Amino acid sequence: MANILRKVIENDKGELRKLEKIAKKVESYADQMVSLSDRDLQGKTLEFKERYQKGETLEQLLPEAFAVVREAAKRVLGLFPYRVQIMGGIVLHNGDVPEMRTGEGKTLTATMPVYLNAIAGEGVHVITVNEYLSTRDATEMGEVYSWLGLSVGINLAAKSPAEKREAYNCDITYSTNSEVGFDYLRDNMVVRQEDMVQRPLNFALVDEVDSVLIDEARTPLIVSGAVSSETNQLYIRADMFVKTLTSVDYVIDVPTKTIGLSDSGIDKAESYFNLSNLYDIENVALTHFIDNALRANYIMLLDIDYVVSEDGEILIVDQFTGRTMEGRRFSDGLHQAIEAKEGVRIQEESKTSASITYQNMFRMYKKLAGMTGTAKTEEEEFREVYNMRIIPIPTNRPIARIDHTDLLYPTLESKFRAVVEDVKTRHAKGQPILVGTVAVETSDLISRKLVEAGIPHEVLNAKNHFKEAQIIMNAGQRGAVTIATNMAGRGTDIKLGEGVRELGGLCVIGTERHESRRIDNQLRGRSGRQGDPGESQFYLSLEDDLMRRFGSDRIKAFLDRMKLDEEDTVIKSGMLGRQVESAQKRVEGNNYDTRKQVLQYDDVMREQREIIYANRRDVITANRDLGPEIKAMIKRTIDRAVDAHARSNRKDAIDAIVTFARTSLVPEESISAKELRGLKDDQIKEKLYQRALAIYDQQLSKLRDQEAIIEFQKVLILMIVDNKWTEHIDALDQLRNAVGLRGYAQNNPVVEYQAEGFKMFQDMIGAIEFDVTRTMMKAQIHEQERERASQRATTAAPQNIQSQQSANTDDLPKVERNEACPCGSGKKFKNCHGRKSFS
């Protein structure tokens, strides 16, 4: 272990020596840049672009380009990047993560690689965690870029598509991680190229990269549409039922936060809902509602997992930042179950139209880099998932903060008394204090205790984060007491007020340890910026969530040896700190394993999504006749239909093929079994294909000109692809839930998901081609409707296509439930196009 640690340290030192060598080369240009006039310095941007076009690489331009930005920042902002900031900028340009402590000037560091990469003209995205930081950084640092002749855009959620397109077309675009993800999804749902807003994804520089790529890695971005609200009563009934249960009726697994009915709970459910067997297959939907109601009532906690807004909306609380996640909803019906629990209006369930995780969103960029003050603990994940190294950058000045040993109390009450007493003592002498909590509930509790003690303070949590930047900026003033939920206010520096250094600087008090060491380090890092004095002190109790779930047995044994009897007794020990860190490492390992599994599942969706989106983009951007593609779909559809009956009795096979042709290819009376008898399969395929081509030509002849034909082809394909893809996403979600249960049968659920997901994807492609074929062959095309179709294209519901086949199944040939479906899929009619008829 010692040898491994020594090797890691040596590698870091070697990397720093390389960075320092390049940084010195950047610094060697300083005098030359000082001597340039403003006009000459600004002219360097055009010079760099020309040199890049002639074949110089960005790496060759780096020393001089970085030097230009340093000098520009000095003239425009009065700020001159230090050597360590140059080193951080080099790491960012290389597509890695410089670990730079709080207050070391990460925002200024980013200007150098952002400028250099913008020279290539392919766009640079600077990603922040909220719109306040995007706007602030774009406004402040944008002055430097604009002065140097580069365009800067800000992409905000409230902007129109035209404004977003303008922002993305700038050399440098500031955006939040969620908005850039949603724009990507929306771009892959439009029907016209002019409605797209993004350019190809080139270089993303992510601020607070650990928050986005680690903490939110499992968070999917979902674009969805509403479905029927008839299920609301089921949510309410399930909620009423679980509220009748006692603790013996359900079983909770504390470490995994899962819950299920016990035998007595099952008996009560069968009695309550008048069932003979709760787990009969026809009750699958009901068990889903009950499971969600159990989770909502006994796992999800008010003011910890979610809050209820003043207007009665359930808002998710981000467990890592303490902020509410506006616009986000728990998936799979859990949000509706919580709404039923809290007695607020139940919003309609939604159907997913498109989704992507941050892991796969940001891996699509040609180059990805990020900044943070705390990433070394997650180095393995950054390397394995994102192919990014973590390079610790030295501080410009030595760290003067004093990190005190943790204090452990037997109970929550004794711990909070000690916290209040510490705050009171420090506040009396005027030392500013930042009290960090992991939950809204805890911050409210401490606030009440400070009010009782007569200590004025500010509270910063998920309920009032709109003021967070202002509150955090004042947290370093003399006498300030600030309670902050977790890392609320992250991204805003706490600067010390007058006379505070003499009082010991900012004191950070942690009210419990977080599951992640990184989050604790972030809290500590709010104090002692740029060599300022400061202190940090963590208060723990045996009743803390981390201790209760992961560390209590060992630590209790340790405390038994210490003879911890009285409630206010406090333990201060280095061994305790090691035990706590060991518990945190176990949790971090569990969380990493979970994120890895999410990625394995999502990679299946990613591969399929990339195929669909690439083909979709080809259709949208095509300025040509899509006839060859549609004809190929028609041919494959015919081939599949004929092949599906290759092993059937010949008479039955011919009858089935004729049924397929009549319903999907040609006018009903224009084909009979008689003309196909005696032909081989290949001959049948060719005969049907030639008939289909003739009808295809007839259909297109009804359109006015080539422009109308291309538009019709595009809308036809996109409408069907989008409908099938939406259904496929839901089917994959259901498959994922189903294969999760197979782990109990010793099957690898990920392998099963990959295999079945691939087969489902192939089936979807076949279904798309079948629907394109049938609609192309059977549509009634009205030229006079073309203009209206163009206007409504974005809804993917063109008015120039009306299927000749009525939705009424009486218009279909009579097919029995268990016969082969006439579409040629090979499935039984009841499991294919007859499903709606029989449901």
Curated annotation (Swiss-Prot):
Example GO CC term: the record gives: plasma membrane
Q: Which PROSITE patterns match?
A: SECA, SECA_MOTOR_DEAD
InterPro entries, per database record: Helicase_ATP-bd, Helicase_C-like, P-loop_NTPase, SEC_C_motif, SecA, SecA_CS, SecA_DEAD, SecA_motor_DEAD
Is Ribonucleoprotein included in the keywords of this UniProt record? no
Q: GO BP, one example?
A: protein transport by the Sec complex
Q: Where is this region: Disordered?
A: 780-839
Cofactor binding, note field: May bind 1 zinc ion per subunit.
Q: Which residues bind Zn(2+)?
A: 821, 823, 832-833
Enumerate the Pfam families for this protein. Answer: P-loop_SecA, SEC-C, SecA_DEAD, SecA_PP_bind, SecA_SW
Topology of this chain in the membrane:
Peripheral membrane protein
SUPFAM superfamilies named in the record? Helical scaffold and wing domains of SecA, P-loop containing nucleoside triphosphate hydrolases, Pre-protein crosslinking domain of SecA
Enzyme class, top EC level, equals translocase
Record CDD domains: DEXDc_SecA, SF2_C_secA
Q: What segments bear the compositional bias annotation Polar residues?
A: 791-809
The record's similarity note reads: Belongs to the SecA family.
Assembly, per entry: Monomer and homodimer. Part of the essential Sec protein translocation apparatus which comprises SecA, SecYEG and auxiliary proteins SecDF. Other proteins may also be involved.
Briefly state the protein's biological role: Part of the Sec protein translocase complex. Interacts with the SecYEG preprotein conducting channel. Has a central role in coupling the hydrolysis of ATP to the transfer of proteins into and across the cell membrane, serving as an ATP-driven molecular motor driving the stepwise translocation of polypeptide chains across the membrane.
Q: What's the name of the protein?
A: Protein translocase subunit SecA
Source organism per UniProt: Streptococcus pyogenes serotype M28 (strain MGAS6180)
What is the primary gene name for this protein?
secA
